[in-house]
């Protein structure tokens, strides 16, 4: 399980990316790369990393559900994810 500080850092980065998204797009369209460099580092969407919403795990992230593969398996086995069931053929 990830430290609370790591989870908080990712949330903070996501807020910064959202805050500067319009300004970043406008500067990029103008080709004003000097002004683009003056924006905060964490305002770049490249610095975001998907994390499990429950555990904060950075690897094995499933975009469709927003959780890691481990949490997905546990929740699917318990029947907590609608429309997901164990395959059998």
Swiss-Prot record:
Domain of life according to the entry: Bacteria
Instruction: Give the signal peptide, or none.
Output: none
Its quaternary organisation is: Part of the 30S ribosomal subunit. Contacts proteins S3 and S10.
What family does the Swiss-Prot or TrEMBL record give for this protein?
Belongs to the universal ribosomal protein uS14 family.
UniProt GO molecular function: rRNA binding; structural constituent of ribosome
Would you name any one GO CC term? Answer: small ribosomal subunit
Matches recorded under InterPro entries? Ribosomal_uS14 (IPR001209), Ribosomal_uS14_bac/plastid (IPR023036), Ribosomal_uS14_CS (IPR018271), Ribosomal_uS14_sf (IPR043140)
> Pfam family of this protein, just one?
Ribosomal_S14
- What HAMAP family does UniProt report for this protein, alphabetically? Ribosomal_uS14_1
List the cysteine pairs that form cystine.
none
Q: What role does it play?
A: Binds 16S rRNA, required for the assembly of 30S particles and may also be responsible for determining the conformation of the 16S rRNA at the A site.
Instruction: Please name the PROSITE patterns in this protein's record.
Output: RIBOSOMAL_S14
Picking any one GO biological process from the record gives:
translation
What is the name of the protein in this document? Small ribosomal subunit protein uS14
Q: Which UniProt keywords apply?
A: Ribonucleoprotein, Ribosomal protein, RNA-binding, rRNA-binding
Question: Ribosomal protein: is it a keyword of this entry?
Answer: yes
């Amino acid at each position: 399980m990830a430290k609370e500080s790591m989870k908080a850092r990712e949330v903070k980065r996501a807020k910064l990316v959202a805050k500067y998204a319009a300004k970043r797009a406008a500067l990029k369209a103008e080709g004003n790369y000097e002004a683009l460099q003056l924006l905060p580092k964490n305002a770049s969407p490249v610095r975001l990393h998907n994390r499990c919403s429950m555990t904060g795990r950075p690897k094995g992230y499933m975009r469709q559900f927003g959780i890691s593969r481990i949490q997905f398996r546990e929740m699917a086995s318990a029947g907590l994810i609608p429309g997901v069931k164990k395959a059998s053929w």
